[in-house]
Curated annotation (Swiss-Prot):
[2Fe-2S] cluster binds at C61, C135, C207. GO terms for biological process: isoleucine biosynthetic process; L-valine biosynthetic process. The active site is at S485. The modification N6-carboxylysine is found at K137. The keyword DNA-binding does not apply. Functions in the biosynthesis of branched-chain amino acids. Catalyzes the dehydration of (2R,3R)-2,3-dihydroxy-3-methylpentanoate (2,3-dihydroxy-3-methylvalerate) into 2-oxo-3-methylpentanoate (2-oxo-3-methylvalerate) and of (2R)-2,3-dihydroxy-3-methylbutanoate (2,3-dihydroxyisovalerate) into 2-oxo-3-methylbutanoate (2-oxoisovalerate), the penultimate precursor to L-isoleucine and L-valine, respectively. Pfam families: ILV_EDD_C, ILVD_EDD_N. The keyword Amino-acid biosynthesis applies. Mg(2+) binds at D94, D136, K137, E459. Belongs to the IlvD/Edd family. Its EC number is 4.2.1.9. Transmembrane segments: none annotated. This is Dihydroxy-acid dehydratase.
Amino acid sequence: MEFKYNGKVESIELNKYSKTLTQDPTQPATQAMHYGIGFKDEDFKKAQVGIVSMDWDGNPCNMHLGTLGSKIKNSVNQTDGLIGLQFHTIGVSDGIANGKLGMRYSLVSREVIADSIETNAGAEYYDAIVAVPGCDKNMPGSIIGMARLNRPSIMVYGGTIEHGEYKGEKLNIVSAFEALGQKITGNISEEDYHGVICNAIPGQGACGGMYTANTLASAIETLGMSLPYSASNPAVSQEKEDECDEIGLAIKNLLEKDIKPSDIMTKEAFENAITIVMVLGGSTNAVLHIIAMANAIGVEITQDDFQRISDVTPVLGDFKPSGKYMMEDLHKIGGVPAVLKYLLKEGKLHGDCLTVTGKTLAENVETALDLDFDSQDIIRPLENPIKATGHLQILYGNLAEGGSVAKISGKEGEFFKGTARVFDGEQHFIDGIESGRLHAGDVAVIRNIGPVGGPGMPEMLKPTSALIGAGLGKSCALITDGRFSGGTHGFVVGHIVPEAVEGGLIGLVEDDDIIEIDAVNNSISLKVADDEIARRRANYQKPAPKATRGVLAKFAKLTRPASEGCVTDL
């Protein structure tokens, strides 16, 4: 790949940060430490590139990132004037943690990742950053950390997993979650239940549908912070290896031209990112994370920007969880660049936004494949969309005065009026499924699991999957002050602000109340008289904090509401 910059090129020191340590004659101990890690005399004038991966053995999404990081380091070291230094930060496997209290740490991990990247690179004076994320919160955490530093940076996505298979049926992580509901209702044998679990995840790579990881990778490539094809190159592919081999030249180009995240992550670039999320039918988590990434670079993006773009952007991608296809299928027809090329042709994107190649978004995709709408139905044309407007809708009303996020594919309808069934937490809901407490026409209300009340705003993938598996996915709705996995589908509303423990009306809902959700008029309302609401509020007792020490308590104290991205950056 060729790299270029259309702006004015000025002479610049590539090591303008690291020279603070390597060239200062009053820092002999610093320089001795560098000799200790193997530096030669000639290395002290090189620009230092920090290569951070979220590699660890315990998650298929992340188990290969160390290998990719080593390839990137080799690419950097083979590039004249650069030296690569690897470091690592943490991750949380949403697929493993979902359904248990450990899921409270997932969103928190985004902030820990951002803080640790900023901390390490800031302390070590790295001149540039390459981040290698895999699982969901890894991506926004990486971008937030790089945005705070505002030094030349590139994100290399770890890549998507291949599909699993059992008895001729293609499987993915959500297949395993939904098998629970089938088991509870007696709709799957023990043998097949075990068979699904054993075969859903065949190896390394992020969960394969248009779930949160692939959604965020697509958004960040469109934003301009990854090389073209990074989002759709599979974890196990020659293309992903080739991408790693290109990073040395790519990051040197950014250093030479002093192209920083602030040059790339503009308001228009974020609008492009939101557009691709809508077109691909992406995760509700994109709302939280794009708002947070924009905040880190000083660009104001709100929930209302999502609604504005949703109103004029159709869903074209037929991807799981609500559709048929996986990210590996998009890769076969040209990946994200093919979709971007089509959208640019149709006037749906800002083509003049700068990217990490030094080229504009439009220049990046000039040679991408053209989508053939006769030979594939993974991506539909604008004139034949899956849904005429975006699937992510921002709803307001007395249940969500600060807003909420609905994921409405259109397959489940756009209006739901039903009877409330209240659950104080995730396990309470699962118990309700097992006891037959939920029936067609009900609105499940799961509360006290928001950013403060959770704390950590855990995902409700286990409940929504159990609902689908139990055969209630098309006849029940679910609302929560928590959030959803990218694997969630059905009539669901999350991110309700204010959350229950912050005085939100969701904390006052009782069984048999009537709740109305209108995705056409963007409203969510509790149909209870004002005097009855006042009576309940007078008698309300706020639950005691679930965490009083440690990182969860810290998050609960610092976090902004979901409508502001749950950022903790003061």
